[in-house]
Regions:
Chain A
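Hydrophobic transmembrane alpha-helices
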Residues: 1-47, 51-62
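Interfacial aromatic-anchored transmembrane helix boundaries in multi-pass membrane proteins
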Residues: 21-36, 58-96, 129
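Alpha-helical transmembrane segments in multi-pass membrane proteins
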Residues: 12, 16, 20, 41, ...
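Residue-level signal for functionally critical sites in structured catalytic/ligand-binding pockets
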Residues: 7-12, 35-38, 60-64, 78-81, ...
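Membrane-embedded alpha-helical hairpins and interfacial helices in multi-pass inner-membrane proteins
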Residues: 29-31, 71-73, 94-195
């Protein structure tokens, strides 16, 4: 008989999407100075692998665009995060706090670079949210456009993605073993927690 | 040939240190309602998952022995063929609703759509299930906005629409109030009358006494007792095995110990009433 | 009482009285995006405004003006001015109009700002128009008709429902945390500490629910290899509609070529 765990992935992906929304919403309700709106992508990507992560990112981007049309142009970024979470988790990055911080920083860096490129080529270097104002202030102070785009996007991404990765880590630590055995990246976590 | 047969079945979950099912042998017959009881963590749900074909395909782990459904080994069944042979309903009303349909009518139709049934037949089958379960008033509602009891009835309807011969039902009422519970048992009664083969896990022991033809008692993964419902419950020692026994069965037992046994060992209220009325009238005649 | 009219409604395609709403969802998207693409080739803000007006007219034609205009204005009035202002006051240009500290208003900045602000109006128009003229289940139906697997439909529809469900649960948990005296106000660190206890039960609960849902949907033949059928269905696209869409596409292509040549 066919393996049914493919089914489980199909049901986890929408959860990742919804958690991205809810995380962002709670961050707003608690007036946190962070977005925390990619926790679902990080977590599901980490436990269910790059492919699931990419889908979470894609679907999140599409549904968030309804209320936040600018996001649509950053769809690559949304998917990149899922891909990276899945890949880094496979390499054991989400198994300890220091490694998780490392994963967050790497992801913030890469996503920051790709975000700046998008902002640079599509939006004259201005990010589409607070980063746009930050970039603008830099430009206004005489910093070249490309540098403003990079500095504003990267700093914001790294500041946001490290805590996001940590929250994902806390969630993953509390996922029961019986769930891990059914997940693509599950073995990584089972082996890590055994020790 | 038995309908469902287990031969020397043992099963261990991945990473577990002991077997969740230990060397189980049993043959189920067509058209009967089997009550499965036993203490918490005994392995009842595992047993149901096994028959539903989820072990080992979904859970992984080590399965030894053989499970035959209608003569075919469980590992050889296609999952969609199994879905149209065995229906499965469990306790949580919230996870059994798909969450992708806008009306209860469409929700009940989902399984038939997946099987590729033609539209007219879907409409007929859904309509007839809706009638049987008396949920006409719900068909236009959004399934995601129903109460727990309503959702559980829709879950039953969705499975019944698939017209499976076998139904595995695991604690269907543990999250429902008394009204919800009696609605569900009305449905189970109906299914039994239609000649379905039913495996029912239920902690409300009086309901098992009333509905089950046979009872299986599972403790720590072993099938420790089985037999006709009245025979199983006439053995009061079961109390020591962490199994509840219907109050009426205890009463019958008390009568026996008092030297005034009922003619037949009563386990439900109506049986007891019959016996008591009979005894009463005998006295009057004397 | 069984509602026979309701049941009969599944026997015929889902249709409304409005011709625009009755277009195949993919054709709608095709038309909206084709219109939107014009902006990229003309680079005149006036063109962008005209296209925005066309979207508003389409909303009127669909009988959805009311549901369109409020989200459109809410989005447009935030995003448009935002795109304008950051460019107008920060973009480094030659023709200085006003300069004070980091504020640096130039003619180039203003032109760029107007250009981008109006493009974003068009983007908002497309998205809002999609949400008010296309039902998610109709979209997934037509995607399946062109060969997208129904797993993808499930993921899309399920995501939309779960967003609603989890948001509701969030509010419940936030309230109960507050009433249990867990601080959700106070300084940043207090608030950060409140984040995980709110999110984590939601998330973990949903994950364990996903396992049960897998089992429940398995019992509903979810993994069946048979091609699935559809109870609820849309009409096959009429020839006239196909011609209309092709004409619109050709017309727009023509306009775009014109724009490039000009
Ligand atoms: N997915 C799983 N992975 C590992 N062990 C499991 C899993 N599910 C159940 N078990 C273990 O298997 C044993 C049998 O559990 P099972 O759920 O079948 O019992 P049950 O009789 O249904 O209990 P209850 O009355 O509480 O529903 C228990 O020891 C349980 O901890
Ligand atoms: Mg159980």
């Amino acid at each position: 008989m066919k393996n049914r765990n493919m089914g489980l992935l199909i049901f986890l992906i929408p959860i990742g999407v919804a958690v991205n929304f809810v995380g962002g919403q709670i961050a707003v309700l608690l007036k946190l100075p962070l977005f925390l709106d990619t926790i679902g992508t990080f977590t599901i990507g980490a436990i269910a692998g790059p492919f699931a992560g990419i889908l979470v990112g894609l679907l999140t981007c599409l549904s968030i665009s309804i209320t936040n049309p600018q996001s649509l142009f950053y769809v690559i970024n949304f998917m990149l995060m899922g891909l990276l979470a899945g890949y880094l988790a496979k390499k054991g990055f989400f198994t300890t706090v220091p490694k998780t911080i490392g994963a967050g920083a790497i992801m913030g860096l890469i996503v920051g670079i790709s975000g700046s490129l998008i902002s640079y080529f599509l939006f004259n270097g201005f990010g589409v949210s607070g980063t746009g104002v930050l970039g603008g202030i830099l430009m206004g102070s005489g910093v070249p456009v490309w540098a403003s785009a990079f500095i504003s996007n990267m700093s914001v991404d790294i500041i946001d993605k490290v805590p996001t990765a940590l929250v994902a880590y806390l969630i993953i630590r509390n996922i029961p073993q019986k769930t891990f055995v059914k997940l693509p990246n599950g073995n990584v976590f089972l082996n890590a927690y055994k020790k | 040939m038995s309908y469902i047969e287990l031969k020397n079945v043992s099963y261990r979950y991945p990473l577990a240190e002991t077997d969740a099912l230990k060397n189980i042998n049993y043959a189920f017959e067509e058209g009967k309602l089997y009550g499965i009881i036993g203490e918490n963590g005994g392995g009842k749900t595992t047993f149901c998952d096994l028959i539903k074909g989820l072990i080992p395909s979904f859970y992984g782990g080590d399965l030894t022995g053989e499970v035959f459904i209608k003569g075919k080994e469980i590992r050889e069944w296609e999952s969609s063929a199994l879905a149209s042979t065995i229906g499965y309903i469990f306790q949580n009303p919230f996870t059994q609703i798909s969450g992708i349909k806008e009306t209860v009518f469409e929700e009940i139709a989902l399984g038939l759509e997946n099987l590729g049934v033609e539209r007219e037949e879907i409409i007929d089958r859904v309509t007839s299930v809706v009638r049987q379960l008396k949920i006409e008033h719900l068909i236009k509602n959004n399934p995601n906005k129903l109460s727990g009891g309503q959702r559980q009835r829709v879950a039953f309807a969705s499975i019944i629409a698939m017209e499976t011969d076998i139904l595995v039902i695991d604690e269907p009422t543990s999250q429902l109030d008394p009204k919800g519970t009696s609605d569900i048992f009305e449905i189970i009664h109906l299914l039994k009358e239609q000649g379905k083969t039913i495996l029912l896990v239920e902690h409300k022991i009086d309901l098992i006494a009333e509905y089950a033809d046979e009872v299986l008692v599972i403790k720590q993964g072993e099938l420790i007792t089985n037999g006709k419902t009245s025979d199983v419950f006439s053995n009061v020692n079961l109390l020591n095995e962490g199994v509840n026994i219907p109050q009426i069965a205890l009463l019958s037992n008390d009568m026996k110990e008092q030297g005034k046994p009922f003619d037949t060992f009563a386990i439900t209220r109506s049986q007891a009433r019959e016996q008591i009325l009979k005894k009463g009238s005998e006295k009057i005649c004397h | 009482m069984m509602d026979e009219t309701f049941i009969n409604s599944y026997r015929s395609p889902q249709l409304s009285k409005n011709w625009l709403l009755n277009l195949n969802p993919l054709n709608k998207i095709n038309i909206y995006i084709a219109l939107g693409l014009i902006t990229l080739f003309f680079q005149h803000w006036q063109v962008n405004v005209v296209i925005t007006l066309v979207f508003i007219l389409l909303a009127v034609a669909a009988g959805r003006f009311k549901s369109f205009i409020s989200p459109f204005l809410k989005l447009g009035l935030v995003i448009g001015p935002f795109f304008f202002i950051v460019r107008a006051i920060f973009w480094p240009g030659e023709n200085m109009i006003f300069n004070y500290g980091i504020i640096n208003i130039t003619q180039e900045g203003i032109d760029l700002g107007i250009q981008y602000a109006t493009i974003m109006l068009v983007v908002c128009g497309i998205l809002v128009l999609c949400t008010v003229t296309i039902k998610a289940e109709d979209l997934t139906y037509s995607l399946e008709k062109i060969g997208v697997p129904h797993n993808i439909s499930f993921m899309i529809l399920s995501s939309l429902q779960l967003i609603i469900d989890l948001k509701d649960k969030t509010n419940v948990i936030m309230d109960s945390q507050r009433s249990r005296g867990i601080e959700t106000e106070g300084n940043v660190f207090v608030r950060i500490k409140a984040f995980v206890p709110v999110l984590s039960p939601l998330f973990l609960g949903a994950i364990s629910g996903a396992e049960e849902k897998t089992i429940a949907m398995d019992a509903r033949a979810f993994s069946s290899a048979n091609p699935n059928t559809h109870l609820r269905f849309l009409r096959p696209t009429p020839a006239l509609e196909k011609i209309l869409v092709i004409l619109v596409d050709i017309l727009i292509l023509g306009l775009i070529i014109l724009g490039v040549v000009l």
